Amino acid sequence: MNVGHIVSVIGVVVDVEFAPGQVPDIYSAVKIRTEDQEDKSTKWNLTLEVAQHLGNNRVRCIAMSSTEGLKRGMKVVSTGKAISVPVGRPVLGRLLNVLGEEADGLEPIKAEKYYPIHRPAPALVDQSTKAEMLETGIKVIDLMIPFLKGGKIGLFGGAGVGKTVIVMELINNIAKQHGGISVFAGVGERTREGNDLYHEMKEAGVLEKTIMVFGQMNEPPGARLRVGLTGLTMAEFFRDEEGADTLLFIDNIFRFTQAGSEVSALLGRMPSAVGYQPTLATEMGQLQERITSTRKGSVTSVQAIYVPADDLTDPAPANAFAHLDATVVLSRAISELGIYPAVDPLDSTSRILDPQVVGKEHYECARGVQSVLQRYKELQDIIAILGMDELSDEDKLTVARARKLQRFLSQPFHVAETFTGRPGKYVSLKDTIRSFNEILAGKHDALPEQAFYMAGAIEEVMENAKRIEAGA
């Protein structure tokens, strides 16, 4: 047994000295347990991860849980391997922490297989190059930013514009329709949201096909930095061993970066731009490159990415952009209009919005909607200064249509029924394209624009218009 002892504790960073020639490897796990200590009055079961070799047989470790009460001289045992977490069928339907330990108060997990959380990304030759669209039932996403099956999708937005609500709705729509295995990694987010999600999924009956891994806001940075890898490792097992199409939801990638920044400062690394860690791009790459689809199976990931101060050029969101197949940008200006989901259809992009993949009709419909909205955006300055009366008849019609399209891009969500008081709507891609084509063709120019707000397909808009007329 390889035993060392603590020589210093600074917050969550612990320096440990081992015997010469017995120094554990980088990324290997070391443990502080009650049975190894002389003083057994305090219960200890603390896992740390080796982050640096300091020389003189000393290593610098990051704790995965609270270091309160640690003293110099306490014994530390090296496990000789990286943090390993249970994988496979026994983990389904469970709520776990960063170490793969049960956090739902149910019986212990009896898993046959354990995987280390640090694993190489699949080789380029093993990766899949198939392009197929994944239907979500959310109009603005399916039409303007189609998701790639087995791709990486990022939801970018500042505080309070609805990232988590969209992630929840996607879980509701895709996990229920898809019927496959879903993994949810809660990285540094609110405990309340995790609790709500757990109970919602339990009620919806999708929990037995879901694994939930949490490293919440109140946990040390070590746990928040590694919980994304824990969730990913569990998803990789189903992709590689069972050839399954797995869904991976991560909320929030920014907190992963933030935890890395905290740890980096404690390790004494020189900060880079905006105070972030110098290894930001490497850390992001190590996580993102593993989220991929192979010839055996796929991992489709949906990642919420907080944008500090609504600045998309901040290094944390900017670094994530390069790895994604589709970027859904949520706009505060749109949320202020009361249009939810507050997706900016002009700023968001998808790699597969291409006639070769989605078909000519879908592509032309999406580009038609974009061009009307873009023209409206250009005219807004003129409207603000001179008013609507100064516009040509053609531009007046464009503005009227754009306002209808903008409102029609809103949609009532199943997970937000308690807030909106409206039943959620799942709109098929076929209905979405048909509805938008009719608006672009001018078939519904006579309908009032408020009829388009929070509707499903175009038939519901017509019903709303009749109701408004009857009420008037």
From Swiss-Prot:
InterPro entries: AAA+_ATPase (IPR003593), ATP-synt_VA_C (IPR055190), ATP_synth_F1_bsu (IPR005722), ATPase_a/bsu_AS (IPR020003), ATPase_alpha/beta_chains (IPR050053), ATPase_F1/V1/A1_a/bsu_N (IPR004100), ATPase_F1/V1/A1_a/bsu_N_sf (IPR036121), ATPase_F1/V1/A1_a/bsu_nucl-bd (IPR000194). It is an enzyme of class 7 (translocase). It is found in: Cell membrane. Keywords: ATP synthesis, ATP-binding, Cell membrane, CF(1), Hydrogen ion transport, Ion transport, Membrane, Nucleotide-binding, Translocase, Transport. Its EC number is 7.1.2.2. CDD domains: ATP-synt_F1_beta_C, ATP-synt_F1_beta_N, F1-ATPase_beta_CD. It is a peripheral membrane protein. It catalyses: ATP + H2O + 4 H(+)(in) = ADP + phosphate + 5 H(+)(out). One of its GO terms (molecular function) is ATP hydrolysis activity. One of its GO terms (cellular component) is plasma membrane. ATP binds at G157, G158, A159, G160, V161, G162, K163, T164. HAMAP family: ATP_synth_beta_bact. Belongs to the ATPase alpha/beta chains family. Produces ATP from ADP in the presence of a proton gradient across the membrane. The catalytic sites are hosted primarily by the beta subunits. F-type ATPases have 2 components, CF(1) - the catalytic core - and CF(0) - the membrane proton channel. CF(1) has five subunits: alpha(3), beta(3), gamma(1), delta(1), epsilon(1). CF(0) has three main subunits: a(1), b(2) and c(9-12). The alpha and beta chains form an alternating ring which encloses part of the gamma chain. CF(1) is attached to CF(0) by a central stalk formed by the gamma and epsilon chains, while a peripheral stalk is formed by the delta and b chains. This is ATP synthase subunit beta. The gene is atpD.
